[in-house]
Amino acid sequence: MIFDEGTAKNYDEWLKTSQGRYIDKREKALILDLIAPRRGEKLLDVGCGTGEHLLLFKDRGCNVTGLEPSVPMLAIARQKLGGNAELYPGRAEELPFPDNEFDIVSLITTLEFTDDPAKAIGEAIRVSRGRVFLGVLNSCSFKAIQRRFGELFRPSLYRKARFSHIYGLTGMVRQFLPDARIQWGSVIFLPAGWYGFAVGLEETIPVMKNPFGAFLG
């Protein structure tokens, strides 16, 4: 599934809302805790979208590369990053890079829209010489139920999304790396609409090895 210009703009507009900013902050905190990027590391973000996570990693001193199949999203990423990232069109299942090219490879809400998630994971492992981060929409979360219910009444890009759970995700990873050391956690536990008044409650919930947050990494 390739996103059009309207989807790209809607995503960036959502990030400007109070709920979008809070959810984005929580997700990025989990991503940084798990990846622990270091200055000078080479990082590839597969399915980089409009470049939000490339900016995050660039600010941590990484040398960033992004790959994205959507031309409109890639155009926005170029506007945001200028010459501070190498950006390529392409698909997660066919990465145009040699083996062991990057210290870190991330796929953040990318597997949901790939034709072959296992192949995409295998490609990420192939081009990484260090860490691979998989960030997904969690099928075992309250928000996943809300999204699926909402699809019955209005069109949604989530209708074609493939949600994941931790056991399916780790199973795919172990097809390629049977002895991999896997660290994981999740965030965003509350229903949509609660984040105007229940931020304190969200932040009391344990994150690491909690399988019920809407964003799982």
Language model regions located:
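A conserved beta-strand element that flanks and buttresses the S-adenosyl-L-methionine
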Residues: 106
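A short glycine-rich, Lys/Arg-flanked "PGG" loop and its adjoining helix->strand segment in the class I
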Residues: 118-132
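Short alpha-helix
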Residues: 160-185
